[in-house]
UniProtKB/Swiss-Prot annotation:
Family: Belongs to the HIV-1 VPR protein family.
Statement: the UniProt record of this protein carries the keyword Phosphoprotein: yes
Assembly, per entry: Homooligomer, may form homodimer. Interacts with p6-gag region of the Pr55 Gag precursor protein through a (Leu-X-X)4 motif near the C-terminus of the P6gag protein. Interacts with host UNG. May interact with host RAD23A/HHR23A. Interacts with host VPRBP/DCAF1, leading to hijack the CUL4A-RBX1-DDB1-DCAF1/VPRBP complex, mediating ubiquitination of host proteins such as TERT and ZGPAT and arrest of the cell cycle in G2 phase.
Subcellular location as annotated: Virion; Host nucleus; Host extracellular space
Name of the protein this chain belongs to: Protein Vpr
Key words, A-Z: Activator, AIDS, Apoptosis, Cell cycle, Host G2/M cell cycle arrest by virus, Host nucleus, Host-virus interaction, Ion channel, Ion transport, Modulation of host cell cycle by virus, Phosphoprotein, Transcription, Transcription regulation, Transport, Viral penetration into host nucleus, Virion, Virus entry into host cell
Entries under Gene3D superfamilies matching the protein: 6.10.210.10, VpR/VpX protein, C-terminal domain (1.20.5.90)
HAMAP family reported in the protein's UniProt record: HIV_VPR
Organism listed in the record: Human immunodeficiency virus type 1 group M subtype B (isolate BH5)
Superkingdom of the source species: Viruses
Chief place where the protein resides: virion
Region (Homooligomerization): 1-42
Keyword Phosphoprotein attributed: yes
Record-linked InterPro entries: RetroV_VpR/X
């Protein structure tokens, strides 16, 4: 009978800790490429829409990833 493999890898960080670290890295990168007033407005919109929730954190991560991807894609192709 098949058995699930035992967990032999290193312990992973908790999801919420990893998510907050990712958000911090994305914010630091976004500040280097976009005006702070835009980013502040985006943060305000997310907060007004989602409040102080994990859904808001996930939304801002998704939007920052998309913005940075498009920014770099356009920058490299021109």
């Amino acid at each position: 009978m098949e058995q699930a493999p035992e967990d032999q890898g290193p312990q992973r960080k908790p999801h919420n800790e990893w998510t907050l670290e990712l958000l911090e890295e994305l914010k630091n990168e976004a500040v280097r490429h976009f005006p702070r007033i835009w980013l502040h407005g985006l943060g305000q919109h997310i907060y007004e829409t989602y409040g102080d929730t994990w859904a808001g954190v996930e939304a801002i991560i998704r939007i920052l990833q998309q913005l940075l991807f498009i920014h770099f894609q356009n920058w490299v192709s021109t």
